[in-house]
């Protein structure tokens, strides 16, 4: 591919700078070319493929979209998909070393496994009014732990976990208390904390924690505890163009400039080792090869402008593929809202 053609589809990565970073697919950028956005062309170019998927993480590729759309998906995944999290903590007794507000904050960050589509938004009361909770907008958990000496512990025991009973309070100690018809509605998939092994507090004999926590719907834009993802990120697909053969010892040196699996060595026509690109997706674009003058005119690095490698790591509240589908629905609703507003402006 000619250099001028690459500038249309790729970002050039040089030793000291990055060039061709601006979008070029709009009318007027190239002389005598019609680059008007076309829906059929967009559908043809749009491609999505899942690389790996399990209960917590998903890696997938999406191409044929602008960076603004890719970033919109990332931001929606982080901040705009509704989930349940603890919002109200009513402390009955807390004689631990952790202050009430710190304990409440730690409990608030514990992820809850509950389908948010089964709940309504909680209506916060006006100043001076009392909150009204229902079984359709609130989930109630209780925690009651008291630390005592273990009567069966050895006299020379030093391990607090054996010396005491309930020396540590875990997220799994939060017990769901069904309200109204919740037990019936969630009979097949009871509400629970995602990870029961999160340490919430440590106790010593005589110390006690007794509280009730209420969870409601929210979004990460309001507080990070509502965010359904631990990470949601993307990077552009790297490109490595070998302009002229790299052989012999140079090929071995060239291979070492990249992470394992990016460059492979094969036997060339003359029997010498020759470098070839094996898997660009493993490249971190460190530009190490550009530090060596012998490769300056033999390789060109870049990134495909509209090809994104997405990585989504769920907190366990929902599967990552479900989260991405929900992000599409949120973006669609935003577009419909803008469309409706524009129609109202035009009608006025």
Curated annotation (Swiss-Prot):
InterPro entries membership: DNA-dir_RNA_pol_30-40kDasu_CS (IPR001514), DNA-dir_RNA_pol_insert (IPR011262), DNA-dir_RNA_pol_RpoA/D/Rpb3 (IPR011263), RBP11-like (IPR036603), RNAP_Rpo3/Rpb3/RPAC1 (IPR022842), RNAPI/III_AC40 (IPR033901), RNApol_insert_sf (IPR036643), Rpo3/RPB3_RNA_Pol_subunit (IPR050518)
Q: Which gene encodes it?
A: rpc40
Function description = DNA-dependent RNA polymerase catalyzes the transcription of DNA into RNA using the four ribonucleoside triphosphates as substrates. Common component of RNA polymerases I and III which synthesize ribosomal RNA precursors and small RNAs, such as 5S rRNA and tRNAs, respectively. RPAC1 is part of the Pol core element with the central large cleft and probably a clamp element that moves to open and close the cleft.
Subcellular locations according to the entry: Nucleus
Q: What is its main location?
A: nucleus
What is the native source organism of this protein?
Answer: Schizosaccharomyces pombe (strain 972 / ATCC 24843) (Fission yeast)
Keyword annotations for this protein, in alphabetical order, are:
DNA-directed RNA polymerase, Nucleotidyltransferase, Nucleus, Transcription, Transferase
Q: What is this protein called?
A: DNA-directed RNA polymerases I and III subunit RPAC1
| Alphabetical list of PROSITE patterns matching this protein | RNA_POL_D_30KD
Q: Cite the GO molecular-function annotations of the record.
A: DNA binding; DNA-directed RNA polymerase activity; protein dimerization activity
